[in-house]
Structures are given as structure tokens and as C-alpha cells.
Amino acid sequence: MAEPTVGAPPAPGAAAAHAASALLDWAAEPRPDRPRAVVITGPSGAGKTRFLAQFLAASGRNPRITVHATGFAEGQIARTLAWQLGRHLGYGPLDPDRLTQRLRSDPRPVLLVVTDLHRAGRGPDHLPSASPAAVVSELLGPLLALPNVRMIVESDTVDLLRAEEPLVLGLDPAAGPTGPSSADPVRAPAPATAIAGPDWRTATAEEREHALDRALATGTARELLTDPGYLVHGSVAAITATLADTSLSLPRHLREVWATAAPALSFPGLADSERAALLHAAATGRDPKLAEYLRPLAETSSWTALWSLPRRKSAALAVLPTDPAGPGTAVAADTLGRLTCHSLTDGRTLASPDSGTPWTPEALAALTPTCLLGLDRSGILHPVPLTTATVPSSAAHLTLHHNAATLASPADLPTAVAAGPRHAAVADGRGRVHLWPLHSPETGPRTIELHRSAVTAVSCLDLPQAGAVLLVTGGLDGTVRLWDSATAEALPSPVESRKALPTALGLADTEAGPVLAVAWSDRRIHLWHLLSGRLAALPTPHLGRALTLTGDGHLLQAGRDGIHAWRLDLAALWATA
């Protein structure tokens, strides 16, 4: 495909040549005296979509042009289109209001591209979301009102965007066959018949995408929405739009379950088993009947929800070192510092230890089976004993050291903590990690500088047979870095670097070897097999501030959405990654 330039227009016709030149010039040079919106318009068959595709291809090769996010508006409502844009921007799937808030605080000048605006809208005809105008009023309009946002929009009509004096680039009708009708093909009545039988696994992509649109036209939407098989395989945009209709009588927990799962379900390229696993995870702890129905298909995925406590909002989480043959115990702290011990097997509450003086947890690390290291949101470290046993000397040494350092230099404020059987790690706002030997804390920490900005997460793993310790950090620079005591050096390149921020880390020595779990701010968990460098990505329906991985493949996540436990089939995970 030829790159559109001033001298080589990307589509036939004088209008396309003029539009190509004008668009490239506008995109490359943002100026206060220029419009902040461009509308690509023209009749059906004018080649608007092809024109934009060529522009996007050219922008990737032009250092003066950066398109930060592209949204495909056909068949979308404001909420699902916002999820698309949020993912491309590195924020993750955010609803329109939160996306607008994030962009308002984003220091970048941002360029967005939206295709097929005139074909946006989904769901029951009597709801505003069925119209493209709702996408403008609820999403694109507020985004365009931000001074750092520019936008290129494809639309059959200029007035739909309602932008103030946009640059309008009109295209001539292309030669050859007429393009698709400007009528919305998603919402138009379809002549295709309904699928025979309840097995959605055999349905075509077109049947899955449009089944609910047809059911709305025939008055059978409720029957489809109460079919768990359709919820696994159906259109995320169509289901999200239709569930907004409160006149539809549906099972009591369905809307809550779907609202939890839908942002993660909207990630492209998910396998059927992964969609089932996500929906099963959202139903676990909310709708036992639906969760049990989905469990057989969910268990064909390499990751499955074990248990979930969605009402148990938590600020920090740690797994206690225990007898390997035992069931294991996780300790969670809520936003007021109150502690609860949970069984790793089923999540049941085992105890509620007194945490002493109220505090505001930022992180927890297990130093011993009876004592945790707590990091307050103010940056103060303190031991958190679970029993009346004496606080270990290692906890006293490192808390005194770092709290004194913080008083002397606020830049040394701890930002993350982690611990293993032999070492504890304290990270700070200067990008450093202080590695403490727990059996000889009087020798002081070893300090390693891994980032040039604050550390957001840290994890350490003792490897006794190798006589080494692995240290992994995540930073505000969007990188994850690995340091190995065997070489006393960090890897020259990050393990991973993304637009999103690493918010929590888990590191464990498993039967498959050392495995690293990284929770990202865009609702993804990345699992790294460190020996082979293989990566498996899990979209998660939950927001998590804390993450823990155990040697037997239990992955725990905690945050404002509660506490959630996953079973990882590590052998299958790497086989399919």
C-alpha cells in the first residue's frame, strides 16, 4: 500500500490528493491557530476508511506524527469505544468519565483517530446509546474539550461531531463498485436466520456478533441474555449496550457480573476458553449458579478462578511462609489496616489478628510466619506481629534504618517492600532497592540502583540451591527490571517496557522454574517464564494493588475490587503462550 504524501495521493481523485496533503500537514504541525478536529467526510464509496488506513500507516513512519489511539466506532457505544481508546493510550479499559479525567492530567499532546462515527450506536432503539450522537455527547465531545487533545474523525456528515470549526476534508466517490450502505449494518434488521441449537462454539463470527441485534428486533433479547453460552461467545458491545436497558427483567446478579467482566472481555483476540475463564472469575463470589455453569469451559483455560471475595476491599496482601504440605495462609489488610487471614485453598477466614495502632497500608511483606513488614502510605515502615511473639531483630533493624533515613532525606521514602525466607527488599523514590539479609541484619543492606524514577513494585526470590537471590522491580518509567546476585548486575535491558505502569509483582520458584507475575495498570497480568523468556498475558476483570504468586501456581490479587485467587496451569500456560 503506497504511503500518502502531498505528491502521491492515497486515493483516486483530486479531493483525495488535497485531503492527503492537508491532513499530513495538520497532523505534523499542531498550532494554536488551527482547528483541533478534522472530519474526513464524503458519500458512500468515497474511500474514507481506506484513506484513514493509509494515513495511519504513513504516520507510523513519520517521526513528526504520532497517533496515540485509534477507535473503531462501528457498532460501539460510548463506554465500549472508551475502553478501546483507553487501552491504546496505556490506561487500560476506562469508562468515558475516567478516560476524560486521565487525559486531562496527561501532559502529552494527544492525537486520536476515530473511524465510522456515523455507524456508532448499539442496543435497544429507545435508549440514547443506540444513536451515534450519544458517542459524541458522552465521549468524543468531552475529550475534544480538553486543550491537549486533537482528533481525526471519519463521518458521513460534518455536523455529527459538533466540533467548533473543524477542518473538513471531503473525498470524491471512488471509481468502481459502490461501498457499503451508510445505514448502520449492525442495527439494521438482518435476513440471516437464528442459529439452530444452543452450541455457540460452532457459530460463525458474524452470527456471534449480530445475534443480539437480531434478538432485539424480534423481541427475544432476554432469552439470549440468560443463555450463559451466548454470554461467553457473544458481542461484548451488544451485550453491554443491551444490559443498560433497565426494563429488561434479568437474573439478579447478571448486570453486576457482566459489568465486572466486560472491560476485560473487550480485549481483542481472546480464545473462547479465556472468555469463559474471565466470565467465570467475575461470577465467582457473586453468582454461584452462573459460576458453576461456566466452570467446565473455564477449566479448559490455563488459568481459572479458585475463589473470590469481591466485598473484601483490600490495600495490601502477603502470603505467610508455611509448611509446604500445608494449605497456606494469605494475610490481607484493608484500608484501615485491619488484618484478616484467609485460607489459600478456599478463601475462608481463619483469623483476624489485631494489627495494633491504626495505619494506612501501602504494602505488606511476610518476614516470618508470625510477623509482617508493613509499609504505610506515608512511607513509614513498621513491624506487624500476628501473635504476641517477639518481633524479630531483622524487622527492628530495617524499620529503624529506613525510618531514620526518611527523616534525614524525604527522597529516600520507601515506596515498596518484599521479603523471602532469607532476604527483605525495600525500594524507594530514587529508583533504588535496599536488599537486607534477614539472618544478619546488623551488616546493613546492599543497595542497587535499577531505575531513574520511583520504584512502584518490588519482589525478591531466594534460590538456596543456587546460592542466589533474584530481585525484580517495576518503576514509574514503565519498565520491569531484573537483578541477580550471582552476577551482581541487572540485565542490560528491561524484562519488559510498556506504556502502562507496573503496579505489583509476584515471584516464585515453581516446578516450571522461576516465574514472574507483573500486574499492570491497564488490567493485564503478565506471566514470565524467566528461564526461557516466554510470556503469557492474562486480562483480568479485577483492579489490583497487590499480587502474590506461590510455588504451586496460586496467583492472588487484592485491591478495591476485593481478594481473588487464580489457579495457574503453568505447563499449559507456557505451551500455549
Give the label of every model feature segment:
Residues 102-133:
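Conserved P-loop NTPase "ATPase switch" module shared by AAA+ and STAND
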